[in-house]
Amino acid sequence: MPISEKSSATNTRLVVKKLFARQLHEGFGAVVRRSIGRFEFRYFDPFLVLDEFSVSAPAGFPDHPHRGFETVTYMLEGEILHEDCEGHKGVIREGGLQWMTAGKGIVHSEMPSSNSNGITHNKGLQLWINLSSRQKLVEPSYQEIESKDIAETEKDGVRVRVIAGEWNGVKSKICTRTPTMYLDFTLSPGSRISQPIPLHWNAFVYVLQGHGHFGDSKLQHSAAAAHHLLVLGLGGDMLEAWNGSDSGLPLRFILVAGEPIGEPMVQFGPFVMNTQEEIDETIDDFENFRNGFEKARHWKSQAASALGLF
């Protein structure tokens, strides 16, 4: 559900919740920092999970299923090899993006690439975005963009990479089933932004590097450093953020906003549907290789085979 806030004299969104993304173990020896999708912040419609991950071979995320939502993988350092039961295979390299619609079902793996040219740490972000009931069982699909093809612009000490949506007339190539804005900002010391956000969309900031201030510079604002998630309240249509650090370091953060779906949501691990009955059907489909999971029956990723898993 949307998070509301007290009205203010301006249209600037204020920070109503601040969370530190604690480390936890996922997959095969992998460590993630989870902010959305943990017990005290389960769901922020339409966002299900936000993980900042760090993996080094042989750790990773071997063969696992999904149904009913989308995953957005954005690499910050290193590269990840992706394989799925449909025969799709590719590498998400540093600065690159994969926007995967799991739809009615996919089984895939995400592991550090064996061709990482000596890179020992592979870091990135993975965001899960819910789909409406009419889109949950669409055919799986991918949108993949290399770093050089992501829309990017720089002005007045502010660099922006447009992952989804647009900034100052610069538009992303990504088509979003659930309307979403995803911007990667880097602010040099002393610089600031005033970024429009659709009035009724839920929005958050996640800080990747440095120390910044978010909110209304004249009324109320929150300071945050790396690994902090800031939930922005409703009641405004603008984010103000600035790098007031004396350290001389840049401030890097993502701003993500999405239109709430407003439907019932039931999640069981990697399956996200609208009712418990649909979850039970999904588990049955997966275990019996039906209705979207047919090709998973005899499939095992090359990465899992190399590690002797499954």
Curated annotation (Swiss-Prot):
Localization annotation: Nucleus
Major place of residence: nucleus
Keyword Ligase (UniProt): no
InterPro entries xref list: Pirin, Pirin_C_dom, Pirin_N_dom, RmlC-like_jellyroll, RmlC_Cupin_sf
Keywords: Nucleus
Record's GO cellular component terms: nucleus
UniProt keyword Nucleus present: yes
Pfam families xref list: Pirin (PF02678), Pirin_C (PF05726)
Family in the record: Belongs to the pirin family.
Protein name: Pirin-like protein At1g50590
